Amino acid sequence: MQVTFCRLRTHQWCFILFNVILFHALLFGTDFVEEYFLHSLPYIDVKVLEIKNKARKLNIEPLRSNLSKYYVLSQSEICKGKNIFLLSLIFSSPGNGTRRDLIRKTWGNVTSVQGHPILTLFALGMPVSVTTQKEINKESCKNNDIIEGIFLDSSENQTLKIIAMIQWAVAFCPNALFILKVDEETFVNLPSLVDYLLNLKEHLEDIYVGRVLHQVTPNRDPQNRDFVPLSEYPEKYYPDYCSGEAFIMSQDVARMMYVVFKEVPMMVPADVFVGICAKFIGLIPIHSSRFSGKRHIRYNRCCYKFIFTSSEIADPEMPLAWKEINDGKECTLFETSYELISCKLLTYLDSFKRFHMGTIKNNLMYFAD
């Protein structure tokens, strides 16, 4: 009887252990597959070598001498004589000064991490309203951190915005080792991100890293805002690309992209445009699951100390998150593992709820019609 009881207990423990291992495998297996298997095959041909050569010999003087042709506000001297480790370009809407102020008080206030200089600037297009433009001018005079391109800041012009800001980085901040493109809705853990980049310092070239999206199909619905005609992009799938909420590229990649901008179709989403440019120059996007992509990561301290970004973070949540990840309290391996599991589960639940609510809304609209 005692032996049978012991055996049953052993079997129970084995069953529990098996389920724990299976749970972790299912939870983190997707990230593992993304990290190691969802990459395009690298290639280097004569054309790619020519692009690299053009990028090295790039003459930026015509752009520098015609500032008013491209930018309303340029901050053209802000990088002069400085060696910047990370240039953060925060893509912001012209009328969202409140959000910019909040970022300036939190993660955007960082000027160095582990002694490595950080420069944070806001990237804008032109507003429709003259009043908003006057407010932006005042904000720029006060903070000296706004770049404003000469194009209307609209959803249709986000590719133009990407081009203008990469162009700015190449022309006016050529000593920046890395360039972070990030949306204003996104929270960034700069200490964690810089620590990751420091491990890449021996490989400063060909860096294009973020949450990589694989086998995304172009939208062929003419009624949809993101419609892409076959004449613009005839392939079945887009090339792998980094989700546009946040990604990083090295300075040499920015220069190569500047060279090929005019050869790439523009009637695609902005982040896809960057991915097509990357393919054009023979570049493989590097995936990291620590970039959240479109997803909002539910807040807890140890989780936010580990990840690089979280999208759609609310205004009240941002100061709390920034304060707690900088409180000096380190997380143990157990705490980090446990809270990462919690974060991931809650994020999946939130995604499911949004999908479910979206389905209900679509059905209601269908019956209303």
From Swiss-Prot:
Top EC group: transferase
Example of a GO biological process term: protein O-linked glycosylation
Ranges per topology, Lumenal: 34-369
Biological source species: Homo sapiens
MF annotations from Gene Ontology: glycosyltransferase activity; hexosyltransferase activity
Membrane-topology descriptor: Single-pass type II membrane protein
PANTHER family with a match to the protein in the record: BETA-1,3-GALACTOSYLTRANSFERASE 9, BETA-1,3-N-ACETYLGLUCOSAMINYLTRANSFERASE
Protein name, per record: Beta-1,3-galactosyltransferase 9
Family per record: Belongs to the glycosyltransferase 31 family.
E.C. number(s) listed in UniProt: 2.4.1.-
Coiled coil regions, renumbered to chain: none
Glycosylation, residue list: N66, N96, N109
Role played: Putative glycosyltransferase that could catalyze the transfer of galactose residues from UDP-alpha-D-galactose.
Cytoplasmic-facing ranges: 1-12
InterPro entries linked: Glyco_trans_31
Keywords: Glycoprotein, Glycosyltransferase, Golgi apparatus, Membrane, Signal-anchor, Transferase, Transmembrane, Transmembrane helix
Membrane-spanning parts: 13-33
GO CC, any one term: Golgi membrane
Subcellular location: Golgi apparatus membrane
